[in-house]
A protein has these predicted regions:
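Active-site acidic/histidine proton-transfer and metal-coordination neighborhood
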Residues: 1-101, 196, 200-204
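Histidine-acidic metal/acid-base catalytic patches
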Residues: 28, 83-103, 109-222
Length: 222
């Protein structure tokens, strides 16, 4: 099992973080996805990385104390660690038994990072995979005329046969998390997440995604 903390969960010294990690230890939840460090336009990049790494070091200590692993998720956009290459700016030098890479194939598609290269970059830290589709949808009346958008599996730009076959070749045995983020609910996700509301038909689309994923996994393992 894995748990996902709020997007602003980046202070390891907070009471919330201390309790969160202790609760995961007590509940035998071994993987904890923390929040994101955002890049602000005009910031110097490497000092921003240094600040984020100091906070990540605190999460690594919490992981060691509670016998869990902290996960950093690749998320396209102005996020430190937005892709596999950038994520290694955060992770390099830390013990991979205490901190890991949670790669997201949908966001890799949006950022244009090659699957094989990205996985090779984070191979030492690879701990979990995020499963969602992503592509750039046309919006001809606006500038730019395309925008990032989520999609059901098989409807976006991710080559799922290649992605999953690469994981099999790497003997990856971590969790694959179906994110259930789709075109019809992107506004909801960006505003409030699913804590307070969810779009209609979510379970049905999610079930189709899981069936799609299992079908490819079966073909890949054959």
């Amino acid at each position: 099992p894995m748990t996902s903390a709020p997007v602003d969960f980046t202070d390891p010294t907070s009471t919330e973080a201390q309790r969160f990690y202790a609760a995961c230890e007590a509940a035998a939840v071994p993987l904890i996805k923390i929040g994101y460090w955002y890049y602000q336009e005009g910031d110097a990049y490497w000092p921003a990385i240094d600040r984020a790494r100091k906070e990540l070091e605190g999460f690594v200590r919490l992981s060691e104390k509670h016998g869990v692993k902290t996960l950093c998720h690749t998320h396209s956009g102005p996020v430190l660690g937005s892709n596999c290459a950038g994520l290694m700016h955060l992770l390099t030098g830390f013990d991979p038994s205490h901190v890991g890479a949670y790669i997201d194939f949908g966001h890799m598609a949006l950022d244009g990072e090659d699957l094989a290269m990205g996985l090779a970059i984070v191979v030492e830290y690879l701990s979990a995979g995020g499963i969602k589709g992503g592509f750039h949808a046309p919006q001809p009346e606006k500038t730019p005329p395309f925008r990032p958008q989520f999609a059901a599996l098989g409807a976006g730009s991710v080559d799922w046969h290649r992605a999953l076959s690469l994981l099999v070749k790497m003997n990856f045995d971590g969790p694959l998390c179906v994110h259930t983020e789709y075109e019809f609910d992107e506004t909801i996700i960006r505003q409030v997440g699913y804590a307070d509301t969810k779009p209609p038909g979510l379970e049905e689309v999610a079930q189709k995604d899981v069936a799609f994923l299992r079908g490819i996994l079966a073909e890949t393992a054959a």
